[in-house]
Curated annotation (Swiss-Prot):
This is Glutamate--cysteine ligase. It is an enzyme of class 6 (ligase). InterPro entries: Gln_synth/guanido_kin_cat_dom, Glu_cys_ligase, Glut_cys_ligase. It comes from Vibrio campbellii (strain ATCC BAA-1116). Keywords: ATP-binding, Glutathione biosynthesis, Ligase, Nucleotide-binding. Pathway: Sulfur metabolism; glutathione biosynthesis; glutathione from L-cysteine and L-glutamate: step 1/2. The lineage of its organism: Bacteria, Pseudomonadati, Pseudomonadota, Gammaproteobacteria, Vibrionales. The gene is gshA. The keyword Secreted does not apply. Belongs to the glutamate--cysteine ligase type 1 family. Type 1 subfamily. GO terms for biological process: glutathione biosynthetic process. The keyword ATP-binding applies. Gene3D superfamilies: 3.30.590.20.
Length: 522
């Protein structure tokens, strides 16, 4: 019996483990107008305060909505919450719709992309200033690419099954070590996520005007595409950050990770210093370091812990260890009215469990770069049959198809146990469906979307057609987990909380920022 099989057997000895995963979704979507152009209106009043509403906020721009579900332990509950949030939001948007694709709708100029506004409190102004810094550093277009983040945690019963009873400190160390082992395996094998679920093989030609690229794009009308691409969102054209390539952040332990993050947050950037921080009395960015704050670190997966008030993400990890992980490699699913499907969630259950139960040796920077090369190959040409990927840095290679089939042999073992615990065969059905996609790349989401793009004569037309369909679907939805009253109560509560935040400030904005960044001088 392999180590993986032995660990799976230990965990499966308590079937309740598989019913207790913690899951949450954060979904981003642009508001757009009837004509397919980006909406330039403020955040809809009926949604309350984007600063304090726990379900509905904004990301980079006023027009970039972000929906956040609480932690759920049942997939139907999670999907129901997400559908309820979409339904309520659409009822407050008038004729505007939600863009169903990761790559943006038509944007006339970067000036149309208005920074998200959160009110007049110091914390709110800091959020907008951070976005001003992002705009000046990378341009606004890159910042309105939409994605889906999937938050995931194992229950205490999972750790009990593998490690028996432990005191609090030992359990905390066990969890952190195991989540970092999972993260290393995610870097090794997570390219399967863009292979199956990448949904950005094409983009609007205006998106790369003035940007240099070596990619051999083909054209349909105003749309540029790569015939075998899966996720241009994850490529150098999308939401990545070349300025961060000098950073060496390791994933072998929580201490190594936090040391790397601490260095990154303090490292100055000559390029960003040229922008200036406060010029003629106006702030341009929070500071001129490579990262203004920790959130600027680009990563396809992050170790996380819920923060206390005023606490930075790294301080929360230092205090209590890793509590959950955030998967950040999902494009918006263009075939789901809520941007993600139940099948995707089930696959992630399987894949993340496999990544945690499989062997995961320490990884140096050289090896990490080799795995990143595999990701880049899959992102740009993943649907090319026979695509060869590297096995570490030793020069060995294996085809994407062979490698994926090998992983699925393990995933199927997990699926049997999960289905046995839950009743039914939902997990095995997901394995059946996705494994067929390994040998038929045209069935993947990027393959299907590119085919639609060709049929419609461009990406914008596909986006508008799907957006209209999903608007009707979301409006027709009946509440499953929440109610209109619960949503309206949260709107009112959020407005009150924003007001309280604005009334409780005692410092000037200058002093507030100096106080916040005092830790950089330590």
């Amino acid at each position: 019996m392999t180590d993986f099989a032995a660990r799976l057997k230990q965990v499966a000895s308590n079937p309740e483990v598989f019913k207790q995963f913690g899951r949450g979704v954060e979904r981003e979507t642009l508001r757009y107008r009837q004509d397919g152009h980006l909406a330039t209106t403020p955040h809809p009043e009926g949604l309350g305060s984007a600063f304090t509403n726990k379900w509905i906020t904004t990301d980079f721009s006023e027009s970039l909505l972000e929906f956040i579900t609480p932690v759920s332990h049942e997939i139907p509950e999670l999907m129901g919450q997400l559908k309820d949030i979409h339904h309520f939001t659409q009822t407050k948007m008038g004729e505007e719709k939600m863009w169903p694709l990761s790559m943006p709708c038509y944007v006339g100029s970067e000036d149309d992309i208005q920074l998200a506004q959160y009110g007049s409190s110091n914390s709110a102004k800091m959020k907008t200033l951070y976005r001003e810094g992002l705009k000046r550093r990378y341009g606004s277009l890159m910042q309105i690419i939409s994605g889906v983040h999937f938050n995931f945690s194992f229950p205490e019963s999972f750790w009990d099954a593998l490690h028996g009873e432990q005191d609090e400190e030992a359990r905390q160390d066990t969890k952190s070590d195991a989540y970092f082992a999972l993260i290393r395996n995610y870097y090794r094998f997570g390219w399967m996520i863009p292979y199956f679920f990448g949904a950005s093989p094409a983009l609007c030609g205006s998106f790369i005007q003035g940007r240099e690229t070596d990619l051999p794009f083909e054209k349909i009308g105003g749309t540029l595409f790569l015939p075998k691409a899966t996720s241009l969102r994850l490529s150098d054209l999308g939401y990545t950050n070349s300025a961060q390539s000098v950073l060496k952040i390791g994933f072998n332990s929580i201490d190594q990770y936090l040391d790397g993050l601490s260095d990154a947050i303090r490292r100055p950037s000559e390029e960003f210093a040229e922008i200036g921080v406060k010029v003629d009395g106006e702030y341009r960015q929070l500071n001129s370091n490579i990262l203004q704050i920790e959130n600027e670190l680009y990563a396809p997966i992050r170790p996380k812990r819920v923060t206390k008030s005023g606490e930075k993400p790294s301080e929360a990890l230092q205090r209590g260890g890793v509590e959950y992980i955030e998967v950040r490699s999902l494009d918006v699913n263009p075939f789901s009215a809520v941007g993600v499907s139940e099948e995707q969630v089930r696959f992630l259950d399987l894949f993340l469990t496999w990544a945690a139960l499989s062997d995961s040796d320490p990884m140096d920077n050289c090896e990490l770069e080799c795995w990143r090369d595999n990701w880049n190959k899959v992102i740009v040409s993943g649907r090319e049959k026979g695509l060869m990927l590297q096995i570490g840095c030793q020069g060995e290679r294996l085809s994407l198809q062979d490698w994926a089939h090998r992983v699925f042999a393990d995933l199927r073992q997990i699926a049997v146990e999960m289905d046995s615990a839950a009743g039914g065969n939902a997990y095995q059905a997901v394995c059946d469906k996705l494994e067929s996609w390994i040998d038929e790349p045209e069935l993947t989401i990027s393959g299907q979307l590119l085919e639609l793009t060709k049929e419609h004569g461009g990406l914008g037309k596909v986006g508008c057609a799907l957006g209209m369909k999903f608007r009707e679907e979301n409006l027709a939805h009946s509440y499953e987990q929440y109610s209109a009253d619960a949503m309206e109560t949260e709107v009112a509560t959020s407005l009150e909380k924003q007001k309280q935040a604005e009334q409780s400030d005692t410092l000037s904005f200058d002093d507030f920022l100096e106080d916040y960044f005092a830790y950089l001088k330590q």
